[in-house]
């Protein structure tokens, strides 16, 4: 399972869905441009 947009995440263990990235300073999955 991957983390969806806006979900809380850990930047050191990024489990966000493809196309998303865990923001290191706000700890939620955002669009990876």
From Swiss-Prot:
Coiled coil: none
Keyword set includes Secreted: yes
A GO molecular-function descriptor: sodium channel regulator activity
Alphabetized SUPFAM superfamilies for the sequence: omega toxin-like (SSF57059)
Xref: InterPro entries: Huwentoxin-1 (IPR011696)
Pfam families in the record: Toxin_12 (PF07740)
GO cellular component assignments: extracellular region
Signal peptide feature range: none
Keywords annotated in UniProt: Disulfide bond, Ion channel impairing toxin, Knottin, Neurotoxin, Secreted, Toxin, Voltage-gated sodium channel impairing toxin
Organs and tissues of expression: Expressed by the venom gland.
Compartments, record wording: Secreted
Ranges that cross the membrane: none
Paired cysteines (S-S): 2-17, 9-22, 16-29
Keyword Iron in record: no
Function as written in the Swiss-Prot or TrEMBL entry: Voltage-gated sodium channel Nav1.7/SCN9A inhibitor.
Family according to the record: Belongs to the neurotoxin 10 (Hwtx-1) family. 22 (Htx-4) subfamily.
Record protein name field: Mu-theraphotoxin-Ep1a
Native source species: Bumba pulcherrimaklaasi
